[in-house]
A protein has these predicted regions:
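Catalytic active-site module of serine/aspartate enzymes centered on a nucleophile-bearing elbow/loop
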Residues: 231-250
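Active-site loop/oxyanion-hole signature of alpha/beta-hydrolase fold enzymes
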Residues: 46-87
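Conserved HGGG/HGGXW glycine-rich cap/lid loop of the alpha/beta-hydrolase fold
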Residues: 2-59
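Short beta-strand immediately N-terminal to the catalytic nucleophile in serine-hydrolase-like folds
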Residues: 88-90, 115
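Short beta-strand/loop motif that positions the catalytic acidic residue
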Residues: 202, 208-210
Length: 250
């Protein structure tokens, strides 16, 4: 896969198709494969994605990760590719990065898609931040997955949102998650925008996708963007916990 360099860091990216440019950004702990597993090939769309800083095959530095930095990385990729106008979207953390990018570069973004937003002008819920911080603490340790199961917070995760357990355990098998473990502490404490007033300048077509029964991506976060982005359309998906295949098709 091709690489580009920004601020001394190499980023892995991929392009599929030759149509309208659509940059899609993955969630926390994931990688660019998500975009190509989610969207079918379409000759009318040029699907672009990158392993965001500290994810997949992309590098990172010692500085704190933030939505601002991730959005600047994504913008740097589009500048590198010579693409000056494009659609942008993302899942979870990627949705927040997409919103931040659209606010930073409203003159470049033709449209916005957010899928299961994980933060607004407020960070994740304190309970969820504690979950991710605990995972971050054990990722660099030997037998970290076992230590997580022995932590006092583990039963509350299992009781509140058992689906998160499988996600967290996968992190311990991912080299990028283990190497760049601090991202699981940094990002949940950050927020894509500082105030909802930043959204008033977004007049581009916006599609907001959400589903219920998701503690990490509460539906009220997506409704926040629906209320505060002028041209936003909203669609509620079937929750993955009810029908994962239908969720993916939608």
């Amino acid at each position: 896969m091709p690489l580009f360099k920004h601020e001394g860091t190499y980023f892995n990216y991929e392009i599929q198709g030759e149509g309208i440019p659509f940059l899609f950004l993955h969630g926390l702990g994931d990688n660019l494969k998500f975009a190509y597993e989610t969207f079918d090939k379409d000759e009318k769309i040029q699907l672009i994605s990158l392993d965001q800083r500290g994810h997949g095959k992309s590098g990172n530095d010692s500085r704190k990760l933030s939505y601002d930095r991730l959005a600047k990385d994504a913008l740097a990729l589009m500048d590198y590719l010579g693409i000056h106008h494009f659609f942008v979207g993302g899942l979870s953390m990627g949705a927040g990065v997409a919103v931040n990018l659209a606010v930073q570069a409203a003159d470049k973004v033709l449209g916005l898609i957010t899928l299961r937003s994980s933060a607004t002008d407020e960070p994740m819920k304190k309970e969820v931040i504690a979950w991710f911080s605990t995972v971050s603490k054990y990722l660099p340790k030997k037998d970290g997955a076992l230590l997580l199961e022995q932590d006092p917070i583990f039963p509350s995760i299992k009781e509140t949102y058992p689906k998160a357990i499988d996600t967290f355990k996968r992190y311990f098998e991912d080299d990028a998650a283990v190497t760049h473990y601090k991202k699981f502490s940094d990002i949940p404490k950050d927020r894509p925008i500082k105030n909802k007033s930043e959204l008033t300048n977004l007049t581009i077509p916006t599609l907001i996708l959400a589903n219920n029964y998701d503690v990490i991506h509460p539906i009220e976060y997506s409704l926040f963007y629906k209320r505060n982005i002028e041209n936003a359309s909203y669609y509620e998906l079937t929750p993955k916990t009810i029908d994962a295949e239908k969720h993916k098709l939608e």
